[in-house]
Structures are given as structure tokens and as C-alpha cells.
A protein has these predicted regions:
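Conserved ATP-binding subdomain of kinase catalytic cores across diverse folds
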Residues: 11-12, 16-111, 146, 151
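Conserved alphaE helix
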Residues: 128-140
């Protein structure tokens, strides 16, 4: 599929899509469409920030995510920056103010588990298996930080293991 096809699909599909993120098969490849959700109110961030101040735990001070178009723009900017640095991120295929379409990092027809899923599955194999996966996550974060970058939501559930194990 060419860029025009991806853009057309995005423009036709995002207004109809109910979930914020959905998977589709296009011309034999798996893609993800992420659309803007409602803007988030600031009161939760202010409450957590106040609690962090009272407890003198600056690590709990939240980084506001305003949601909506702002969140889409931020995510697009981060994906493009990380990709330009050679870090493995999904390729953005098409984008507009309200949504974007990205290529799946996996192989069509095969599952691409998150690091969180793999850690959960490894629990039965014991702590050595879990620790190896946990260290893989730390190595990934170290690689990102080595480029003077950061991930805003570096949870194991958001880190994807590609078919080549990376």
C-alpha cells in the first residue's frame, strides 16, 4: 500500500473508530490506528502534585498528559525523534491532527508480545527467567537514555518484543 492509501484509510476510519487504539489488516500487513481521546482535566495532576509536595517525594510529581490532539502531537513527535535516532519504534504511515496510523513491529500472523506479557509468562519458569526479561527492559531504557531521550510511559506493557527478540 502506498502513502496515499494509508492516508485515505486513516481519514475514513478514525472518525468511526470507537476505541482509542485499534488493530487492522491492510494489504496483508498489520497496522494500528490511534485516535485522540477526550482532553484530561488538570485536577488529578494538581492533586497528585500536591500530595508529592506534602510527602516531599518529587518523584511522584506528575507529568501532565492533556489528552486530545495535544497527546497525538506529542506521541508523533516522540516516535519520529526516537526513530530518527535509530531506536526501534513503529513506523508512522499517516497522520492528521486527530489520529495516526502506524505499522506493527511484528510479523503478520504472529503475535508480538509485550515485555509485560513475556514477564508474566516467565513467572512459571522461575526468577532467573523473569530477571533476564526485566534486565532486557532495563537495557532498552538505557539505550534510549544513551541518546539523551526518555520514554513517557516506559511500562513493560508498552515495550514490545519483536520477532528477532529485540
Amino acid at each position: 500500500m502506498n502513502n496515499t492509501g494509508y492516508s485515505r484509510f486513516l481519514q475514513e476510519q478514525w472518525p468511526q473508530q470507537q476505541p482509542l487504539v485499534a488493530r487492522y489488516m491492510l494489504a496483508g500487513e498489520q497496522v494500528w490506528l490511534k485516535r485522540a481521546g477526550p482532553r484530561h482535566g488538570m485536577w488529578r495532576y494538581r492533586l497528585l502534585g500536591a500530595a508529592a509536595g506534602v510527602l516531599r517525594l518529587p518523584v511522584l510529581r506528575p507529568v501532565p498528559n492533556l489528552g486530545g490532539r495535544s497527546a497525538i502531537a506529542t506521541e508523533l513527535r516522540r516516535l519520529r525523534t526516537l526513530g530518527a535516532l535509530g531506536l526501534r519504534v513503529p513506523q508512522v504511515l499517516a497522520a492528521c491532527d486527530d489520529a495516526f496510523l502506524m505499522r506493527d513491529l511484528g510479523t503478520p500472523g504472529r503475535p508480538t508480545p509485550s515485555l509485560g506479557d513475556e514477564i508474566e509468562a516467565a513467572v512459571a519458569a522461575g526468577p532467573t527467567a523473569v530477571l533476564a526479561l526485566w534486565r532486557l527492559g532495563l537495557q532498552t531504557l538505557d539505550a534510549v537514555h544513551g541518546h539523551q531521550q526518555c520514554l513517557s510511559q516506559a511500562f513493560a506493557r508498552n515495550l514490545v518484543r519483536c520477532p528477532d527478540g529485540a
